[in-house]
Amino acid sequence: MIEEDFPTVFHDADDIARRGQRMTFRLSKLRLVSAVVAALGGALSWKLGRFDVWALVALLGFMAALYAEIMLWTRRPERDWTAGRTIAENIKSLAWRFTVGGHPFPASMPLAEARKLFQRRVNEIVARDGAGMTFHSVSRQATTRMAELRTRSLDERRQTYLDERISNQQQWYSDSANQHQQRANRFRALLLTGELIAIVLAAGRGFGVWDVDISGVMAAIVASGAAWLGLRQYEKLRLTYSTAANGLAYVSDQLADVPEDQWANSVLDAEESFRKENTTWMASQPSAA
């Protein structure tokens, strides 16, 4: 794929975003699970000499939750996630426009001039969105393969763009929408199961079937599950990706017979649809902290 030959700054930004995403989810999961562990330790008691084992479990739960909270506050991984993704997507869009002759890099523009403009635009993106981020590579120039594809005929550039940009992204949107739908359904089922168990346990204690009160624990489990569902945004992202996939089908049809004199602006319009999706995704991301 041509994207493998994009400037290394694109891959650096993509790596930063992936690491930020992983850390955000791991620390958020640790915080939520630790809260449940602390609630469980607070609800039960088991004395060994002068020590209460469950009280120590609660202590460990609170300490783990505190650690996760501090790490989320100081490291701000969600900031690297969103900023890195924004930079990567903006550079990807710019690289595709350069490669296939989209605005502001029409095929009629001399290669040397297009290269300089591309590097300047990439530098602007990094300067605007990359504050506090460390990039391992300083290469922000259009690569040899990008330049080589740029010199090909309109039909070749069109086919490359339709196959490797539009079709690939449409497939990714479609697959992601289905995955988010499945995950949302599974998680909703788990939450409903947890709520039913909580009702049974509360009813059993209310009618004197047992004396153990773990309704607080079940409440913590349900609340943590709801918080995790809110963080992952399964339903909202499913709708966003489904809409984007349907929109790209229309874009693909529009690009099929565009002549050279309209090609640059048509590619810009297509890339604008990706920008809108990324903006919607950014707006859907809640703060982990």
Describe the residue ranges of each PLM region.
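Conserved non-transmembrane functional hotspots
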Residues: M1-L196, V200-A289
